[in-house]
């Protein structure tokens, strides 16, 4: 009885706490990586802006103050697309950034009803990325819908600018599509850095291990008590890629190098983002900048209407 009471007290204290996860730990990143994270998060945010997926050959613009580093760069898109004719409505762009010497591939997060239906397609399906690798059916289908458009655009850009790095980024659903793009571009011999923000789990352990061990760099960024990295559930056979770069800072606060925990592993129970017992969708919306700022009013209403669903739908 004493042990049961003690357990209940500990559990109650954890539930009432909104300040710290269960296992605090710190490991700072360097200033260069922090600046790269800021740039990549802004490229991910820019993918939500309509003018960045219907006007190829133009400078990337956000118009809402959420991507100043991107707007200040000497850059232009070479491919913009919105696959509205597909069930997944996958959307994004490929751009050349001459200021940062990088070829950018960015995927938009959930912004339409079709995107949300993609999120809810939880079945694991076989992939052609690696032997025995299974992935979330909806996320992988989104990549398949974009693959034949994105891949040749990236290859052409690399041929034209061989000294430039290739980086793939995305937030939320975009962060779920990005690992497949990075993995298959790497399979074609390209050195690709992968940056995701608030990504859900995307596949089984074989896929996670394969992507985590590919060369190029994997940076899976999570924030505070964001609920999206917690789904789909582990019991459904899903795990994350490694490592996790956890931002241990509340929403809309200035983030420094020392605010990160770098956690190796594909499960990370009771560590980083997974340490939280209570979650908040607001933590999903803030990764160095407000990620959804460019959504138009109709799309915002669609997303808000669905946010009353169970947390598994909130990405």
Listing of model-derived features with the role each one plays in the protein:
Residues 2-19:
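Cleavable N-terminal signal peptides of Sec/SRP-targeted secreted and luminal proteins
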Residues 17-113, 304-313:
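Flexible, membrane-associating and regulatory peripheral segments of lipid-active enzymes
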Residues 69-169, 186-192, 215-216:
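A conserved cap/lid and substrate-binding interface adjacent to the catalytic center
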Residues 170-174, 178:
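Gly/Ala-rich beta-loop-alpha elbow adjacent to hydrolase catalytic centers
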């Amino acid at each position: 009885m004493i042990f049961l009471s003690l357990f209940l007290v500990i559990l109650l204290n954890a539930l009432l706490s909104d300040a710290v996860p269960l296992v605090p730990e710190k490991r700072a990143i360097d200033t260069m990586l922090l600046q790269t994270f800021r740039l990549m998060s802004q490229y991910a945010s820019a993918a939500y802006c309509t003018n960045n997926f219907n006007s190829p050959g133009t400078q990337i613009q956000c118009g809402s103050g959420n991507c100043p580093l991107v707007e200040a760069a000497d850059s232009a898109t070479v491919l913009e697309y919105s696959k509205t004719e597909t069930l997944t409505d996958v959307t994004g762009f490929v751009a050349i950034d001459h200021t940062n010497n990088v070829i950018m591939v960015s995927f938009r997060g959930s912004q339409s009803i079709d995107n949300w239906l993609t999120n809810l397609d939880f079945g694991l399906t076989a992939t052609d990325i690696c032997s025995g690798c299974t992935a979330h059916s909806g996320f992988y289908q989104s990549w398949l819908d974009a693959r034949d458009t994105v891949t040749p655009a990236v290859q052409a850009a690399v041929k034209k600018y061989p000294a430039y790095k290739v980086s793939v980024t995305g937030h939320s659903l975009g962060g779920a599509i990005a690992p497949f793009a990075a993995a298959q571009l790497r399979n074609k011999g390209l050195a690709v850095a992968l940056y995701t923000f608030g990504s859900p789990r995307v596949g089984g352990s074989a896929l996670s291990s394969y992507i985590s061990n590919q060369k190029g760099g994997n940076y899976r960024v999570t924030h505070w008590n964001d609920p999206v990295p917690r789904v789909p559930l582990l019991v459904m056979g899903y795990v994350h890629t490694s490592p996790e770069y956890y931002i241990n800072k509340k929403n809309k606060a200035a983030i420094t190098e020392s605010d990160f925990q770098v956690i190796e592993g594909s499960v990370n129970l009771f560590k980083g983002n997974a340490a939280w017992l209570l979650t908040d969708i607001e933590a999903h919306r803030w990764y160095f900048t407000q990620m959804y700022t460019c959504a138009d009013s109709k799309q915002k209403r669609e997303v808000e209407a669905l946010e009353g669903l169970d947390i598994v739908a909130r990405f």
